[in-house]
Design a protein with these regions (language model features):
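Short, mixed-charge, low-aromatic patches
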Residues: 5-9, 34-38, 156-165
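Non-catalytic accessory/assembly modules
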Residues: 9, 37-47, 51, 67, ...
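A glycine-rich, hydrophobic loop/mini-helix early in the fold
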Residues: 14, 23-24
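Edge strands and adjacent loops of beta-rich recognition modules
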Residues: 24-34, 59
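Secretory-pathway-linked proteins and extracytosolic
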Residues: 44, 56-61, 65, 69-195
């Protein structure tokens, strides 16, 4: 879902122009990725643009990061994510700014999950379960642009952002299964490596 608006001040009044469907272009990047590109309507110097979009993804290891800051100022930068509680993620925030708003809500939802068999002769199993869904929301207001400064090697290291990494599966009635390593597991893997 993609929505976008351009706001211009004309004769002392704010004029809102909505993004039309014919200004949205789809590009199939790969078997699993579709990119939507769009051209903002009525863009003029001094205008304000607003856009929002939703990403639905089955790729658990690729929970999208969000940059709250960029090369242009942002009046309001918001990121919302919903994830089932049986997928545990760690979040990493970066940058010098703190969140103006940080919310978490929990609701219940029913899921159908396919569990692959352990070997070639064991069939996949589908289970139905009800579990919590965690809804997170982070907001930064009046975010200044990030500008290149002398002696700065990479602006990417300073941009205000949030990113995620899957750390464990935690299904009800099953043992927790960590997927993110730590220094102890890394050392153990190195010691057990035959090469």
């Amino acid at each position: 879902k993609l929505r976008a608006y351009t706001y211009n001040l004309q004769n002392g009044k704010v004029v809102e122009t909505k993004l039309s469907d014919d200004a949205i272009f789809k590009e199939k990047k790969s078997k699993n990725t579709v990119i939507k590109k769009f051209t903002m309507p009525a863009v003029q110097p001094g205008c304000i643009i607003e856009y929002s979009y939703t990403i639905n993804s089955d790729f658990l290891f690729n929970l999208q990061p969000w940059n709250f800051q960029g090369s242009y100022p942002r009046l309001w930068s918001e990121y919302e994510v919903e994830m089932p509680s049986f997928f545990e993620y760690v979040s990493f925030s970066q940058g010098y700014r703190k969140f103006d708003i940080e919310d978490k809500k929990t609701s219940s939802q029913m899921f159908r999950i396919r569990i692959p068999g352990n070997n070639s002769w064991e069939k996949d199993e589908t289970i139905t379960m009800t579990d919590d869904v965690n809804q997170y929301r982070w907001i930064m207001k009046n975010v200044p642009p990030l500008k290149e400064e002398k002696y700065t090697s990479s602006l990417d290291d300073y941009v205000s952002r949030i990113a995620f990494q899957l750390s464990a599966y935690n299904f009800k009635d099953q043992p927790k299964k960590p997927v993110m390593g730590n220094w102890f597991t890394a050392a153990e893997d190195l010691m057990n490596d035959e090469s």
